């Protein structure tokens, strides 16, 4: 008699995805982040669901409802901070997951990679809308500034912005629809994750060497289930440390001031995980140019399969490309820092140089270094 997990239509899918899945024997801890992202998504949906039970998406009561959650709801404070800081952990894992893909050439699996890029956009849109919901000063002005960027689109821009706002400014209609979309999007993300995994299981996993590993596969369970559980334990511990010791470390103090359309904060900035794109946006004096650069800073990932000029897949044995990759990482961190600084000298020029370097490295220098390495190896 065959095992039920191998014969039952539903269990068979789970078995082929998590238990009997053939996995390369050499994949390192950099491959943990996919499963971690799944865990974070589940945590975000659960905490978000319980928060939504007590939240009201009305401009007059939104701020008070968040206060009520923190003060009056049993363990409401921990739900709120798990959700807010869980988003930060989500993005840390997301950036590391993308970085791993860039370093080890995972973008060669085009379908999986492109669904991943769509997922990144969807998660960023969800996080942005979630940041508006507490209806603090930074929520209101962040929403105003970022949505207003769409007015840079020629001809339809102004109409588009007013259509998104549901009026002539960010107001009750905007908050209500942002709450509706913020609730809906995680389920769309979950569906996209299934598509992402579907394409991923068509090709199998890449490995650090970038060499096909069909001849050296091991079952996912117990080897990688245990390994993923360790990664999850470490990250959940980090999240709990953040939530229980310094829950407001990554937030903005201005968001504890109720939204006031008549009083602009001295320095409007989004959450830390958008700062790199925000810095690129600010570094271009032209509004439309800034918006295009903002979108391209993430959309550039979709070009990675086209920009791959090396005869090797992974960067493991390519020291020149490694230097370029770590320059991109350093540049990303520099942009994140600049995005949080006021618009004044010397931050303006640093931001502009870092933005130019970001596109130059990815579009020109990395493909060039790959060609140089090919020549050095006489390929």
UniProtKB/Swiss-Prot annotation:
Residues binding heme b b562, per UniProt: 83, 182
Q: How is the cofactor bound?
A: Binds 2 heme b groups non-covalently.
Name the positions where a ubiquinone binds. 201
Instruction: Write down the membrane topology.
Output: Multi-pass membrane protein
Name where it mostly resides: mitochondrion
- Cysteine pairings via disulfide bonds: none
Pfam families given in the database record: Cytochrom_B_C, Cytochrome_B
Annotated signal sequence range: none
Any Gene Ontology CC annotation: mitochondrial inner membrane
Residues crossing the lipid bilayer are: 33-53, 77-98, 113-133, 178-198, 226-246, 288-308, 320-340, 347-367
GO terms (molecular function) for this protein are: metal ion binding; ubiquinol-cytochrome-c reductase activity
Q: CDD domains, alphabetically? A: cytochrome_b_C, Cytochrome_b_N
**Keyword check for Membrane:** yes
Family, according to the entry, reads as follows: Belongs to the cytochrome b family.
- Miscellaneous: Heme 1 (or BL or b562) is low-potential and absorbs at about 562 nm, and heme 2 (or BH or b566) is high-potential and absorbs at about 566 nm.
Q: What is this protein called?
A: Cytochrome b
Q: What is the lineage of its organism?
A: Eukaryota, Metazoa, Chordata, Craniata, Vertebrata
State the encoding gene: MT-CYB
């Amino acid at each position: 008699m065959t095992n039920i997990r191998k014969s039952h239509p539903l269990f068979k899918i789970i078995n082929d995805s998590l238990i009997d899945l053939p996995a390369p024997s050499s994949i390192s801890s950099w491959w943990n982040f996919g499963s971690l992202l799944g865990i974070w998504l589940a945590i975000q949906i659960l905490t978000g669901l319980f928060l939504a039970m007590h939240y009201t998406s009305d401009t007059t009561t939104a701020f008070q409802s968040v206060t009520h959650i923190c003060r009056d709801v049993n363990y409401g404070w921990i739900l709120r901070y798990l959700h807010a800081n869980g988003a930060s952990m989500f993005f840390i894992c997301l950036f590391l997951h993308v970085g791993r893909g860039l370093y080890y050439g995972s973008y060669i699996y085009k379908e999986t990679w492109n669904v991943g890029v769509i997922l990144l956009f969807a998660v960023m849109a969800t996080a942005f809308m979630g940041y508006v919901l507490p209806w603090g000063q930074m929520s209101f002005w962040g929403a105003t500034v970022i949505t207003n960027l769409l007015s840079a689109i020629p001809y339809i821009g102004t109409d588009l912005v007013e259509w998104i706002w549901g009026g002539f400014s960010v107001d009750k209609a905007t908050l209500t629809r942002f709450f509706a979309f913020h609730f809906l999007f995680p389920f769309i993300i979950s569906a996209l994750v299934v598509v992402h995994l579907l394409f991923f299981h068509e090709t199998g996993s890449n490995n650090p060497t970038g060499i096909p590993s069909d001849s050296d596969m091991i079952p996912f369970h117990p080897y990688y289930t245990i390994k993923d559980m360790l990664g999850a334990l470490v990250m959940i511990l980090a999240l709990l440390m953040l939530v229980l010791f310094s829950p407001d470390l990554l937030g903005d103090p201005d968001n504890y001031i109720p939204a006031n359309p008549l009083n602009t904060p001295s320095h409007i900035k989004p959450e830390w995980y958008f700062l790199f794109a925000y810095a690129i946006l600010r570094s271009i004096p032209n509004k439309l140019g800034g918006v295009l650069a903002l979108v391209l800073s993430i959309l550039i990932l979709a070009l990675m399969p086209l920009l791959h000029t090396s005869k090797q897949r992974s960067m493991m044995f390519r020291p020149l490309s490694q230097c370029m990759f770590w320059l991109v990482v350093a540049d990303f961190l520099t942009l994140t820092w600049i995005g949080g600084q006021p618009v004044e000298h010397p931050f303006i020029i640093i931001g502009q140089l870092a933005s130019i370097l970001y596109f130059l490295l990815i579009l020109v220098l990395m493909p060039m270094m790959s060609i140089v390495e090919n020549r050095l190896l006489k390929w």
